[in-house]
Amino acid sequence: MRVLLTGFEPFAGELVNPSWEVASRLAERRISGCTVAAERLPTVFGASIACLRTALERHRPQAVVCLGEAGGRAAISIERVALNLDEARIPDNKGQQPVEIPVEPGAPAAYFATLPVRAIVAKLLAAGIPAEISRTAGGFVCNHTFYGLMHHLGQATPVRAGFIHIPYLPEQAVRYPGKASMELATTLRGIEMVLEVLRSEQNVL
C-alpha cells in the first residue's frame, strides 16, 4: 500500500514542528506492507492545499495521513471531521488570519475522515500510547488542509484519508509550563501503528 504522510513547517515562533519530525523520519520506509512517502506542507492558508494536491498527483497514494501539531493536547488525536470553516486564532506564516471564511465556498459543510478511526484509537490504547477520537481539528491551517484534502478526493474515491494531531515535543512544552508533551519515539511508534491498522483494517469506523 502506498501511503502519503504529510507534516507542517514550524509556525508561531516554534523552531520545530513534531508533525514533520515524525513524517520525515518515516519517509521512504516500508512499514507493515506500507510504502511511505512524506511531504512537508507550508503552514499557510491556501498554499497548504495547493502543495498537498501536487503531492497527491506526484505520489498517487492509496491512503493519505496528514499530521499536525496540537500544542496542549496530551494524546494522539485522530480527527473525525473536517469543517468548511477557517477560524484562525493566530496568523499563519504569511500573516493571514481568516475568520468565519469557508475553506471552499459552496462546498459541503463538513467531510468525515475515511480512516478506521476507532480501530486506530483502540490499537494505540492497547499499546499504552495515549490516543483519542477528536471531533474538532480547530480553525487553523490543519483543519483547512484536512477539509481541502477530503474535498479534493471526494466521497467516491478509493483513497482513504484523514488527519491526526500530535502533541508538542518535550523540548517545546518546556517553554509552556503545564502543557502536555509526548516523546518523539512514542509518537513515531504511534504513527507506525496507524499504518499497521490502515493496512489490515478495511472498515471505516
Swiss-Prot record:
Enzymatic class: hydrolase
Keyword Protease carried by entry:
yes
Catalyzed reaction equations: Release of an N-terminal pyroglutamyl group from a polypeptide, the second amino acid generally not being Pro
Catalytic positions are: E79, C142, H165
The keyword Iron is annotated on this UniProt entry: no
* Cysteine disulfide links: none
Principal place of residence: cytoplasm
Show the GO MF annotations.
Answer: pyroglutamyl-peptidase activity
Q: Where are the transmembrane segments?
A: none
Pfam families according to UniProt = Peptidase_C15 (PF01470)
Q: What is its EC number?
A: 3.4.19.3
Q: GO CC: one term? A: cytosol
Give any single GO term for biological process. proteolysis
Family per UniProt?
Belongs to the peptidase C15 family.
Q: What does this protein do?
A: Removes 5-oxoproline from various penultimate amino acid residues except L-proline.
Assembly description: Homotetramer.
Spell out the HAMAP family in the cross-references: Pyrrolid_peptidase
In Swiss-Prot or TrEMBL terms, this protein is called Pyrrolidone-carboxylate peptidase
List the taxonomic lineage. Answer: Bacteria, Bacillati, Cyanobacteriota, Cyanophyceae, Gloeobacterales
The UniProt gene name for this protein comes to pcp
